[in-house]
């Protein structure tokens, strides 16, 4: 991470909302609170979220490293003193007109101060470059904790752990398939693959793969109709079918239909039957296209 003029102009303490004498643990606590509220994953509609999150990360890196923080404090102090001198000079100019000798002395003094400030800035840049090359373990750990907290919040919301009887439940389905925990292929089902399979039935609000149990995921639909269509028609990949069951928001009309397809006792019209056949044909074509695409990507990723 190279130093920027914007970073030198920034008040990192004010950005994190802490005192100048704050200890490392206070800096980290303030970072987690600020970064969690503006994390890009939680603010997809805020174009400045990513920029602010990056600035907070820079602040954490600088203020939790003793050498980088000392260099930054020196630059900050020099700028503050320069601003105070400028203010005093402005007030003095309103009363008297400085003669040439005074201006020459002032220019020499400012030149020396600017050289010192430039040296401090170079020191700060070197410290930040060192942090970039070595890698900031503290920053990575804090960001990992934030990602884990966001993932847990999403899983809790999808599985109904945060219960509120006043909220209207959105339909959620539980997906299962054969997959070994250590297998990187996840049984052929990644998040993108599952989204392609289920988005054709309607808007998917969220989809989370379980981090604890392999071959398990939860999909949340915007409408009950979309969830019903998925339960009735989706079978997944041919070589590794999906088992789909209701988790929340199951309508009364869906009671007794826990597997894809229509029940034996249901009566459908000829038009309904034709629609179902066409949907199954589209599903088969989409699955074949998806399998071919994955095979091409695997071949492209193999060394030649």
UniProtKB/Swiss-Prot annotation:
Residues 11-76 form the J domain. GO terms for biological process: negative regulation of transcription by RNA polymerase II; spliceosomal complex disassembly. Residues 105-124, 156-180 are annotated as: Disordered. This is DnaJ homolog subfamily C member 17. Keywords: Chaperone, Cytoplasm, Nucleus, Phosphoprotein, RNA-binding, Transcription, Transcription regulation. GO terms for cellular component: cytoplasm; spliceosomal complex. Gene3D superfamilies: 3.30.70.330, DnaJ domain. It is found in: Cytoplasm; Nucleus. Residues 178-249 form the RRM domain. PROSITE patterns: DNAJ_2 (PS50076), RRM (PS50102).
């Amino acid at each position: 991470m190279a130093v920027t003029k914007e970073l030198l102009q920034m008040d990192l303490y004010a950005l994190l909302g802490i005192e100048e004498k704050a200890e490392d643990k206070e800096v980290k606590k303030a970072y987690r609170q600020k970064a969690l509220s503006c994390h890009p994953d939680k603010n997809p509609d805020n174009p400045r979220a990513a920029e602010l999150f990056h600035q907070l990360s820079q602040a954490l890196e600088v203020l939790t490293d003793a050498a980088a923080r000392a260099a930054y404090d020196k630059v900050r102090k020099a700028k503050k003193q320069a601003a105070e001198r400028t203010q005093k000079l402005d007030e003095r100019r309103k009363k008297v007109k400085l003669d040439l000798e005074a201006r020459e002395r002032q220019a020499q003094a400012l030149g020396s101060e600017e050289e010192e400030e430039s040296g401090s800035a170079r020191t700060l840049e070197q410290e930040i470059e060192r942090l970039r090359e070595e890698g900031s373990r503290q920053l990575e750990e804090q960001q990992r904790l934030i990602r884990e907290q966001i993932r847990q919040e999403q899983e809790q919301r999808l599985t109904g752990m945060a219960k509120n009887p006043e909220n209207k439940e959105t339909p959620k389905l539980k997906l299962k398939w054969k997959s070994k925990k250590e297998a990187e292929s996840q049984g052929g089902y990644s998040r993108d693959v599952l989204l392609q399979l289920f988005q054709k039935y309607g808007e998917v609000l969220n989809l989370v793969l379980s981090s604890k149990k392999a071959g398990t995921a939860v999909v949340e639909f915007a409408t009950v109709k979309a969830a019903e269509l998925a339960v009735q028609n989706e079978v997944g990949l041919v070589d590794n079918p999906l088992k789909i069951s209701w988790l929340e928001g199951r309508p009364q009309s869906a009671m007794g239909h826990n597997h894809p397809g229509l029940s034996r006792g249901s009566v459908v019209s000829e038009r309904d039957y034709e629609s179902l056949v066409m949907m199954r044909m589209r599903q088969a074509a989409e699955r074949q296209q998806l399998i071919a695409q994955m095979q091409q990507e695997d071949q492209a990723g193999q060394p030649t």
